[in-house]
Amino acid sequence: MSAVEKLPEDFCANPDVAWTFPKVFYTSSQVFEHEKEAIFAKSWICVAHGSELAQPNDYITRKVIGENIVIIRGKDSVLRAFYNVCPHRGHELLSGSGKAKNVITCPYHAWTFKLDGSLALARNCDHVESFDKENSSMVPLKVEEYAGFVFINMDENATCVEDQLPEFAERLNQACSVIKDLKLAARFVTETPANWKVIVDNYLECYHCGPAHPGFADSVQVDKYWHTTHQNWTLQYGFARSSEKSFKLDPSVTDPEFHGFWTWPCTMFNVPPGSNFMTVIYEFPVDAETTLQHYDIYFTNEELTQDQKDLIEWYRNVFRPEDLNLVESVQRGLKSRGYRGQGRIMTDKQRSGISEHGIAYFQHLVAQHHK
């Protein structure tokens, strides 16, 4: 970190008097390379809802900080995760998602692996001196099912997800009691030209909701909205009303609420008014100024109603582009000579619905990994 300004020990520790990271922290490849190792290679990263891996042979692939990962449910129903490369010469093994065969076959030299990662066959290995079959298996990494979702961790010494996000699963299930019944209904994939922290900053405040999200703000009432911080996660919640511009609520729903959870380091779980569906924003940082995002929408029913289809299109064509335009503009603006280098975090004493104290909390956590 020699070429990058060191952060003070108490950076953003007091949210009432706090400024954002110096702009270099959003643009520097040196900073990003440090965060790859200090944060993403040592944290539990949420990659999917459990329904995508519910049955034996189900698999998905994800790219996280340049690593290609495969998560697969074995014939024994055990969920496992591996680096998605052949140990022979490094060719990638599986692509996309779907149903794996009973063995994984490398497209390059046809080495085959069982779904537990062990080597099944390496052609001609009987004629290769001192061939070590035991050390020719796929390389595993940690995986855990938690709160209805699937998390991976590249740190072989990592403890459980609950240690990283204490009490999060309990609170999420209180907000949405049907998590385990959810099924993927839509996914919007964007390679967003913005640093991962810009995207989290944007999520962690509703100061922008009125000006930038008129449809959302017509339903979720910012004057009845709170933001609480917890250990490595935060919760934004508030009361909502039915809106023709966004969430059309069933009249039978009493006291409808919105819940928005951010979890370390960069996954956002939303339980919209009605509490019977969810949206999740998965962030997979690519480089200092690019973040691959999956915006997933989950319902309990497979055959969607017209209202659900209309809501998906509102997310696709209205709400999602609103946020993408914001973070992309910020990333460009951070590099302007007209930006003074840091922005004041607008925390108010009453911690109102438009207070930015959530950003200060997040940035303080990140700063602890830059010591």
Swiss-Prot record:
Q: Which EC number applies?
A: 1.14.13.239
Q: Where is the Rieske domain?
A: 44-152
Q: How is its activity regulated?
A: Inhibited by EDTA.
Record-linked InterPro entries: Carnitine_monoox_A, Rieske_2Fe-2S, Rieske_2Fe-2S_sf, Ring-hydroxy_dOase_2Fe2S_BS, Ring_hydroxy_dOase_asu_C_dom, Rng_hydr_dOase-A
Q: What class of enzyme is it?
A: oxidoreductase
For the keyword Lipid metabolism, the answer is no
What start-end ranges are recorded for coiled-coil regions in this protein? none
- Could you identify this protein by its name? Carnitine monooxygenase oxygenase subunit
Query: What taxonomic classification does the UniProt entry list for its organism?
Result: Bacteria, Pseudomonadati, Pseudomonadota, Gammaproteobacteria, Moraxellales
